[in-house]
């Protein structure tokens, strides 16, 4: 039978996961990131994107908030294994702000992706995120078939 400490940490990781999706992303509250991520946080994203530290993570998230002011993320599936949480998600939004040099088009996006979060204690230390950037660029009208 698991001891109280690992069970408390497991529940803490689930709560952190919930807070990232619901309070940080959907609630637009990046000020919570230091409570939820380690100081030496690392992000591995599509196209070889590598971010180090909470400030770089905050910058990326705020960039998406600017590009898609009505952005909403939905957790479709979550799998917990030890200090890892894997999440299949879907994001929707309207391209009403600049996105990496792409002027706003007013077009809607609806794309799926997956993120694997590695925890140290109850804080996220590292993430690997995968989503179809090509589909997003097509949906905002930045590229055509």
Model-derived regions: residue spans:
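C-terminal and inter-domain tail/linker signature
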Residues: 1-145
């Amino acid at each position: 039978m698991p001891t109280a400490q690992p069970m408390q940490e497991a529940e803490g990781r689930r709560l952190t996961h919930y807070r990232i999706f619901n309070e940080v992303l959907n609630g637009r509250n990046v000020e919570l990131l230091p409570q939820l991520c380690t100081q030496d946080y690392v992000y591995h994203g599509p196209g070889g994107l590598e971010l180090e530290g909470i400030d770089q993570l905050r910058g990326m998230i705020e960039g998406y908030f600017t590009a898609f002011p009505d952005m909403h993320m939905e957790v479709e599936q979550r799998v917990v294994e030890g200090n890892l949480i894997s999440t299949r998600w879907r994001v929707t939004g309207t391209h009403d702000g600049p996105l990496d040099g792409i002027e706003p088009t007013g077009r809607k996006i609806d794309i799926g992706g997956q993120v694997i979060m590695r925890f140290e204690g109850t804080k996220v230390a590292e993430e690997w995120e995968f989503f179809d950037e090509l589909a997003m660029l097509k949906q905002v009208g930045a590229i055509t078939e």
